[in-house]
Amino acid sequence: MESPTQTSEHIESMTEFLVKHYPDQLREISLSSDPKLHYPLFIEYAELVDDNPSLARQVFSDPEHYLRQFDDSAILAHKIALEHMKKFEEKIGIEKRFIHVRINTSGSPLERSPETFPSIGRVRVKHRGILMMLKGTVIRSGAVKMYEGEKMYRCRKCKHMFPIFPELESINSIVKPPFCPSQRSKACEGTNFDPVDDTVTRHDYQEIKIQENTQVLGVGVIPRSILVVLKDDLVDNVKAGDDVVVSGILTSKWSHDLKDVRCDLEPMLIANHVRRTNELKSEIDISDDLIEKFKNFWSHFRDTPLKGRNAILRGICPQVFGLFTVKLAVALTLIGGVQHVDASGTKVRGESHLLLIGDPGTGKSQFLKFAAKLSNRAVITTGLGSTSAGLTVTAVKDGGEWMLEAGALVLADGGLCCIDEFDSMREHDRATIHEAMEQQSISVAKAGLVTTLSTKTIVFGATNPKGQYDPDQSLSVNTALSGPLLSRFDIVLVLLDTKNPEWDAVVSSHILAEVQIEQDREVDDLTTIWPLPMLQRYIQFVKKNFRPVLSKEAEEIISSYYRLQRRSSTHNAARTTVRMLESLIRLAQAHARLMFRNEVTRLDAITAILCIESSMTISAIVDSMGNALHSNFSEEPDQECILFRH
């Protein structure tokens, strides 16, 4: 146990550190109007390491003790800031009772060590009691509760007053010390203590559960989860589906006493700092050199932009030969359009959705898996193993109360949700994703919990046709999917295995030559095939930096095509709705982004129309679009485009 002198020295050095490095935050807290609130004071662990390495080491090795001292130091630093404001700024702040130091460990040595930043599945007893970090996705968010925090007690013998803190391990129970903790010249031997009236501090309290990110796990590895406790200012800062990095102290929680059931200790992380990483996804690993590389690539293809575009598209699922239309559709779906708010205040989604309908062996699942690799956040599921609750949210009972656990669409918020074998889902399960696809949210009313969760998700589905595909019938008949669901997909591509001997010969030659091509390929040559990491960063970059605007010419082309489709005697009622017009705009914007532009040109509008035409079983402007399965890359696409215009 520390002596009073050591404690005062630590608090003094902590106070000095806070006043020196964080005067602006202290000033903001002082000017805040509510004295009853709990205020966070964010500090950087890397700064603490540079300024006072020994103190940083002590905070790491015994965070429970030293973080309490840091909170006391924050109150002292706040009082110094109040005095400074009164003296030099002639402003009177309001004294606050509750300030909590929140240590951001990102960018510090703790982030680079597997001992202090393990995956959730590798958390062990050795991590107990140190400051550590965990990364995961919030899958469950409990209700905000209140608990009694520290409480003052008085020794009957020497009248010494001291605080007792509740033990979260034993369900917030208060355990009195065996003897008086007064540290005077002569030790007190008192063992009886009385609570002091009106000295209880109450805190907000919330339990969440975070799960390992499935994308970093190997095949067949079950993602592990851990309980995280949020207190005071941290409560209600995250919701189900958020990606978070949590810094805190690992401890354990006793299970409830049940007859004939063995008591277990459940690992639990008491959070000190929570950082949402959803917004940071698009900024990862895009260096200035890489941006310059992208610009040089498009400078090289200034006169032949479509050839440059095709070089990018060849990098999508390179093991599958041809299928140009599908690869273009995958790229446009992942890039997406620009979300905007119309005159009535309604949000019009920017995310596109894609459905692949095809015979077995046409590469549908390959595209799904590759798209999941390209996306910064992806959830893959199959229709047979998915229920409405598994796709949206599940109401689960934990400790006598209900809470919501996130499903696939909520976990994929801000990313991609791939649903293979779409036709295997039951009809009422498919109906639950209607709202998620169009309104980008899920409204829930389960077990007395009524809420709305965000699902800004790209839905990528793959399905087999119902029996033999009949070109004379509508998509609804061939796939057994309802019209409202089909209209929500921007692109619906049909891949039919027509057993064409010429095509089979070309494909077999490609597969046999694949090994030799792979050996001869240069890694840095972007003019042939782009590697997966480069594609990921390119898609992230264009989504973040380009917000294309429609030119007058593009508007006229899209509007004329939409009117032509509506007038066509052969149009599909399920597809030719206002949603088709919105899909055309999104796809044209996505193509402009793919072409590294901020304006939607005539070429982008025509490409969007050709994608929609490929989705139509009966075309309104072209006699036959051909089979998407047999669409190959053109050697001279720019010359073909000029001929097409004339």
Swiss-Prot record:
InterPro entries from the UniProt entry: AAA+_ATPase (IPR003593), MCM (IPR031327), MCM_dom (IPR001208), MCM_lid (IPR041562), MCM_OB (IPR033762), NA-bd_OB-fold (IPR012340), P-loop_NTPase (IPR027417)
Superkingdom of the organism of origin: Eukaryota
Biological processes, Gene Ontology terms: DNA repair; meiotic cell cycle
Record key words, sorted: ATP-binding, DNA damage, DNA repair, DNA-binding, Helicase, Hydrolase, Meiosis, Metal-binding, Nucleotide-binding, Nucleus, Zinc, Zinc-finger
Its EC number(s): 3.6.4.12
Motif Arginine finger positions after renumbering to this chain: 487-490
Binding site for ATP: 358-365
Molecular function via GO: ATP binding; ATP hydrolysis activity; DNA binding; helicase activity; zinc ion binding
First and last residues of each zinc finger (C4-type): 155-188
Gene Ontology, cellular component aspect: nucleus
Repeat keyword on record: no
Catalytic reaction annotation: ATP + H2O = ADP + phosphate + H(+)
One Pfam family in the UniProt entry: MCM_OB
UniProt keyword annotation of ATP-binding present: yes
Residue ranges of every copy of the MCM domain listed in the record: 308-511
Cellular localization per UniProt: Nucleus
Family: Belongs to the MCM family.
Described function: Probable DNA helicase that may play a role in DNA repair during meiosis.
Protein name: Probable DNA helicase MCM9
Species assigned in the record: Arabidopsis thaliana (Mouse-ear cress)
Gene: MCM9
